[in-house]
Amino acid sequence: MRLSVIAIGRLKQGPERELAERYRERFDETGRKLGFRGLEVHEIAESRARDVPTRMAEEAAAMVALVPERAMLVAMDERGQNLDSIGFAQKLAGWRDQSVPQTIFLIGGADGLSPELRRKAKLSVSFGAATWPHQMLRVMLLEQIYRAATILAGHPYHRA
């Protein structure tokens, strides 16, 4: 199964981008042994529309353009399900074992994801009740994806 993250906004050069890339590379190395075929990150420029509904619609259209037909969508949303790391790993393993060809995690911009994308998502996931900057959320998501792979591999990285 392929994994992708489609995110609104671009990470600038610096510690966030370096950390995100480190977790992506670590996942690729660990995940390959578990039947995962890599992790791609797609960045989409934020819409410059003045009003929120237009901005969200433009960003949603740009995201949907990158989604293959049979991909499963996971919305990163503050209203989503709060999974612990083991539960998150079990979700990924279950989808892999069901031969889901691709799972795509969607991270909205400053206004969040459009209601249309939230409805299309098979699952909505939250990283707690707090609101996180989308750049920070991307790093946290990539870390959790890597952590999930280490849990599935029996690697000592996860020590809960």
Curated annotation (Swiss-Prot):
Quote the catalytic activity from the record: pseudouridine(1915) in 23S rRNA + S-adenosyl-L-methionine = N(3)-methylpseudouridine(1915) in 23S rRNA + S-adenosyl-L-homocysteine + H(+)
Q: Which GO terms describe its cellular component?
A: cytoplasm
Q: What is its EC number?
A: 2.1.1.177
User: Which of this chain's residues are annotated to bind S-adenosyl-L-methionine?
Assistant: 108
Matching entries from SUPFAM superfamilies are given as: alpha/beta knot
User: What main location does UniProt list?
Assistant: cytoplasm
Give one GO term, molecular function aspect.
Answer: rRNA (pseudouridine-N3-)-methyltransferase activity
Q: What PANTHER family does the annotation carry?
A: METHYLTRANSFERASE, RIBOSOMAL RNA LARGE SUBUNIT METHYLTRANSFERASE H
Its function, per the record, reads:
Specifically methylates the pseudouridine at position 1915 (m3Psi1915) in 23S rRNA.
> What protein am I looking at?
Ribosomal RNA large subunit methyltransferase H
